[in-house]
Every structure is written in structure tokens, then in C-alpha cells.
Amino acid sequence: MEQQNNARIYIVDDDSLSAKVMSSLLSDSGHIVESTTDAASAFDKILDARPDCIICEMMMPEVDGLNLCKRIRENPDLAGMRFIMVSAKAYEFDQKRAFEFGADGYIRKPLNTETFANLVNRILDDHIDMKFWGVRGTLPVPGDQTLKYGGNTSCVTLEFPREQFFIFDGGSGIKNLGDSLMAEKRSRIRARIFISHPHWDHINAIPFFTPLYVPGNEFEILGANQGDTTMRELISAQMDGVYFPITLSEFGSRVYFRDLEEESLEIDGIGVETKLLSHPGKCLGYRINYNGRSICYITDNEMFKETSEFYFPHYEKKLADFCRDSDVLITDTTYTDEEYETKVGWGHSCISKVVQLADVANVKTLYLFHHDPDQSDADIDNKHELAAKMLMERNSSVKLETPKEGDLFKI
């Protein structure tokens, strides 16, 4: 969605200094801002101004933020107006209550002047921030041949306007994610960590994710069990004293675990679908559905060529249906077709099969992901060119991206 650089914003806050700071930050970001410190007259002023967005303090005399939000949501003439609550109340109950009354966002005080305008913009645009923290497969690859795309293994994040925070996989990229969150001085982080499967390149950096050790944070780790081994046991096993000196008991944050099957569920108000994938062991792909947009995270996954004795058309049809019409398909593209000839049965796909899946499923944009550790930046550039050529030969409408470590996309 297009960013609203010139949105008309009305601030209601009985703290004149706070209102002044917010006005300055948003004006510098290109918005047109008005404000009032008089909560009692705010509704009438909003009716006259008809702004695109209201930013309102929750606790004010005479008329509090919840009541003002309720009045606005009950007025059909103000339909479509964004409402962002700001408050020093750090309680989860109050944030939930604000959303129940119709708020589109909840920003805690004291305001972070470095991130405030970006948070408001995300809510205005209603976009999802999708960021890649690691795009490699198998094991990290440092060195001068991996500077462009990065050498870290699988980790992708989705951040939503209402602060829902989804993390996909705990490869070495999650270490950089944790460092970034700590540098931003984020507090009371609530996030879901979705694990595709427990192979090393998808879980082995979880013990190095610093926010797990910070009291006040809360994480749920979700993924498929492996027979009689639960997700909790899978994560704790690699932190056993034999392999690693720190155990789960050292986590300072609240950490929960949930075993998933192939199913559909709702998490934090967002639709989540899971799909069992073609890979050794129990491996899940994820489809995230949010306000008319869908993001599919499909790694690791092997689609056999039609000439293979292992070719399974029923599986590929079900996978295409799972990804159908999605805005984003992030998927295992480990090998070129030539490389794949000697890697059949290793659990990963080649370019032609990935392109075929994206085209048949009519996805909007294909993201090449999970690159082989032996591939240099130049090799990945070549994979991108090969995929682009194949899409062109199919006369496909699918767009192509080969994300680099640190790339941010707004969906």
C-alpha cells in the first residue's frame, strides 16, 4: 500500500509537551498536524477537521481516550478514520481494551522519538513489515563471497500494525534480530516464533536470541512435534548441558511452547494455516492471512521433477492450492536444476519447480530463499536470472525478488 506522506492527523492529549513532541515528529515526517489539549471539546473539533487519523491519550479528564474512540466508531460520518491510542499504561489489558473499542494502534509512552513516526506510518498504511534476517540454508557462510546476500541462515519477521510480531525460524539470522531489538531498546516484547522443522539451520541460534533472557518479554515457540518428541523437548535438547552450557531455565522472559499439526487457526487475530511439506521428518509451511493479504513461508521443501520415480502430482496440487493467490511466496530454492541432478532426495527444490509452483498458484511475488552454502553471491545472482528467464518463458505475471539479509518489504 502507498504510504500516506501527507495524512491529516489530529492529536488529543492533555499533556501539552507530549502533544508538541508528537506534532513535531509527525510534521517532520510530512504529515499535516493539528492538536488540542482539551479532551471535552475534542469530538466537535474532530467533526470539523475530519482528519485521516486521530492520535489520542488514553487517560484524560472529563473524556478519556476510550470514550472518544467509542464515539468516533459509532458515528458513520467518521467511518474509515484511523484511531491510535497513546498511553503510559503498559498493561496488556489496556492495550486489548483499546483494540476492543476500535483503536487501530496502541503506542506506549514514554515515546521513542526514533521509531514513533514509523509506527504511526505503519498503522496509517496498514502494511506488514516483512524483513529478512537470514536467507541461507544448511549452515552460516561468512566470507567475502557472501557479502551481498549475507551468510546467515533462515530467519524472517512479520510486524503488523497492531504490534503483532511473528518470527519464522531460528537460524543464525535470529541473532542479528535480537541484537537489533536490544539496540532499539524495545521493552515488553510479545512475539510468536514459528519453527518450520528442527534441523540445525532453523533452530540452532535460538539460545543466542538475547530478548529471551530479558524479564518482561513473552514468547511462544510453535512448530511440529517429531513423533513423541514435543517442540519444547526439541528446543531444550540442544540446550542440554552436554551440548550447551545454558538451559531453558535461564530464560528471563516467559516462554511457552505449542505443537502444531496441519491445521488452520487464529493467532493474535491473524489467520494462520499450516501445511506438511516434502522434507525429511515433520516440516511445516505457513500461510499468514491478514486483511486481504497472504504471505506463504515454504521451507524446506522438495518438489520432484516429473521424470523422477518420486514425482507426486497430488502433493504438488495441494501445495499450489495452499499458496494460491498469495501476495508473497518465500520458498526453498536451494539448487539450480543442474545442481539438483545430484541432490535428489535431499529435501530441497530446484529453480524450475519453484517457478512452476509460483506460476500455477498465481502468487503475486516469488521470493527465492534458503540458498546452498556453496553458492557465492554471483551464483545467487545467476539463480535470479535463471528464474526470471523461466518466468518470462511461461509468460507469467509473477514478480521476482531475491532478498538480501536485512532487506525490508512492506506488504
Predicted regions and their residues:
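C-terminal output helix
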Residues: 111-120
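Cap/insert and terminal regions of metallo-dependent hydrolase folds
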Residues: 304-399
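The feature encodes the CheY-like receiver
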Residues: 19, 61, 79, 91, ...
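Charged docking surfaces used in two-component/phosphorelay signaling
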Residues: 20-28
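Binuclear metal-dependent hydrolase catalytic cores
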Residues: 125-299, 304-309, 317-320, 378-411
